[in-house]
Amino acid sequence: MVAAGTDAQFAAVGGGDTDTAATTTGERIMFAPGAAHMDDAALRIVLRHELFHYAARAETAADAPRWLTEGVADFVARPPAPLPANAAETIQRGLPTDADLSGPERSLAYDRAWWFARFVADTYGTAALRDLYVRACGHGHPDLSAAVQQSLGSDLAEVLAAWRQWATG
C-alpha cells in the first residue's frame, strides 16, 4: 500500500484523479492525498473496496465490465444501508457505463453498480453474485447477457426489470 504525497503523484503512479480516494493497480493499492482527511469508517470502506480489487485481480479480465467489478467491490466494502428515496428513479437509467463511472455523476453510477450487486445477492444469494462475477468478469468471459443467463437462470431483460422492481421496495 502506498499513500501518494500529491495529486500529481497519485495520477502518475496510481492512475487516479482528484475525485478518487484510492486505486488498485497491479501489485499496489494507492491512496490519494485526500484520503488522509477521511473519517475512519469511510477509510475502512475504501480499503475493503480496494482489497477486493487486489484479491480478485488475478481472476479478473482486463476487459471485464467495469461497473460489475466496482459494484461487487462496493458490495463487499460497504455496510448494508436502506436505499435512498431516489434509488428507484436512478435505477431507471439502467446499468452504468464506463463513461458514467468516470463522469460528473460518478457517485450515482457507483451506487447503481452497488445496488445491482445488492439486488443479485438479496434475490439470488451471495453465491450467485460470486458466480456472476466469475463468469462475467473472468478471463474469456462471455457477454453479460450470457453470463446473467448462466449464473441467474434468467435473461438480462428479466433481471433488469426485477432490479427496478426491487428498488421500489
Predicted region positions:
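Walker B catalytic acidic pair
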Residues: 50
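Surface-exposed, flexible loop/turn segments at secondary-structure boundaries
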Residues: 9, 37, 81
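Acidic/histidine-rich, surface-exposed loop or edge segments in extracytoplasmic proteins
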Residues: 31-33
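A mature extracytoplasmic/lumenal domain signature
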Residues: 3-5, 35, 136
